[in-house]
Amino acid sequence: MVGWIRYVLGLGMDVVLNLHDEYKAILDMFEKQQVTYPVKAFFGELLERPRRTKAYPIALINQNINLDQLLAINNAMKYPLAYIQGPPGTGKTNTIINTIVTAFFNNTTVLFASYNNVPIDNVFEKLTHLEYHGQTIPFPVLRLGNIDKVKAAISYINRLRNQVQTVKIFTSTLDKRKDDRIDRAKRLSARLKEYEEILDLKERKETLSHLMEYQEHIKNAMNLLPFQMDLQGYQMQRLDQRIHQIGEISDSDALQLLDRNEEEFYQYLFYTSARYIKTLEEPKYQELREILDSGENPETQARAFNKYMQKSENVKKLQRVFPVIITTCISAHKIGEPEPLFDMTIMDEASQCNVAISLVPIIRGEKLMLVGDPQQLN
């Protein structure tokens, strides 16, 4: 079933990555029958459609979004697997950013990875430059990677620690509209489910139309007459009735079910983010603080940080401060042991990452969102 993986080598330009630990972890998953949905799908073992989970409130940092993008975010949160494809200019990056913010809002940890630095740097740049009342929101996202990226990450963490020192957190005010958000989430989820059904119905209707056109070309074949009558008189009619029953759904219909109080949401992001960063000052983070405050040369600090991150238990502790971690597919192997450490892995430009290397971030997530161009994503 997966015996062939021992022969897969991960090559990335001049980088050779030893994936022995990843392969062993996958084999252990299968032996213990604890295989995640993403790994099942990777090896063609996902033989039935995964069930939906609960409805998650969708949280947006902007309103530059349409129904298809909302559906992508909704499905990424509700299903263990989501495949998002679209050509350049269709809002894939905006969808990724809003998915990450939605995940953060729902206490979901995220590993965002790509084979290339550019897409993940763009997302990191946007997430770290959100503002509330002229102040930068200390959004708890960490960019890791090679030794230089880790040096920058250590400096960035210490800047955030200094920034939030004087911020007072009033926890009771942060969740005062939680029930309203949950109710909106349920209604939006139901509406998006109907929109998804309409897309499916229209696709089936188009297929039937092509079949009927084909029948016209061979209408002399009497043995096909009952089939043609079934298409025209029953199946097409049922599709039309259901489409009419649901009705048209516009972008504005869905947006009305979102929390559109941007001022209040940015306030929530600011203070909730600050609360996450302040967690780093708790006693259980002493080992990490010693690395951050060591005063040693940056390279020594970075190597100590990488050593700290090799242990899964330390990664899980860090996630309580930085629930969103961004890195390349190759550098993801430095994050803990090869096991599902994150609630969700998001992989951008998915097909540009070779098959072997893609396993590194995939194995570290309970769920998977693949994003790419139709000309690239297979």
Q: What spans do the regions from the language model cover?
A:
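Pre-P-loop entry segment of helicase/translocase ATPase cores
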Residues: M1-N75, V150-K176, L288-F305
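Short, glycine-/Ser/Thr-/acidic-enriched flexible segments
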Residues: E48-R49, Y79-P80, G89, N117, ...
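Phosphate-binding P-loop
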Residues: N64, I73-L81, T102-N106
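Walker A/P-loop
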Residues: L67, K78-T99
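Short, conserved phosphate/pyrophosphate- and ester-handling motifs at nucleotide-, phospho-/glycolipid
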Residues: Q69, N116, D373
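Short hydrophobic alpha-helical runs that function as membrane-insertion/retention elements
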Residues: Y83-Q85, F104, T109-A113, L368-G372
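Alpha-helical nucleic-acid-binding subdomain
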Residues: T99, N106-L111, Y115-D343, N354-I357
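Conserved helicase motor core of SF1/SF2 NTP-dependent helicases
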Residues: I330-M347, S351-N378
